[in-house]
Amino acid sequence: MGSVCSGGRYESLASDGKHAYPGVGISLGLTRLLAPILSRGELSSSRSVPSAVLVAVNAEEDRATSEAVAVALRSRGIPCEVAPKADKFGKQIKHADRRGIPFVWFPGVKHADHRDADTVKDIRSGDQVEADAASWNPPTEDLHPGVIGTR
């Protein structure tokens, strides 16, 4: 099976050329501990990816807008990803659903005299609201994946 935990003292762990410096270290095999629990179905995650939001791409020429939304969300600690390609919104929603991403962000479309508002959709409930990447937050329980115990 292998080691679960190891560690020790290392006499010459680092050197500046003239002096050798000792160090200590420890390693925990969390994957070795969790693998049997996960394989028995006693633990699972609330979603398979860390992203809470998929930012849709209206058209490839608008990808920069979607990337800018993603940068704004990430700068505020909201894990997100940009759709891999511009496609019908239904396909982008299905992509998010397959990956377990609860929200899809639709950047507003630019018109000659203005830009439509961005909207975000909770694909579980179908609720869709106007949103601003500088202030919108998902519910706390959706921000990061969680561990779910079955016992």
Name each region found by the language model.
Residues 1-151:
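TRNA-recognition modules of translation machinery and tRNA-sensing kinases, especially anticodon-binding
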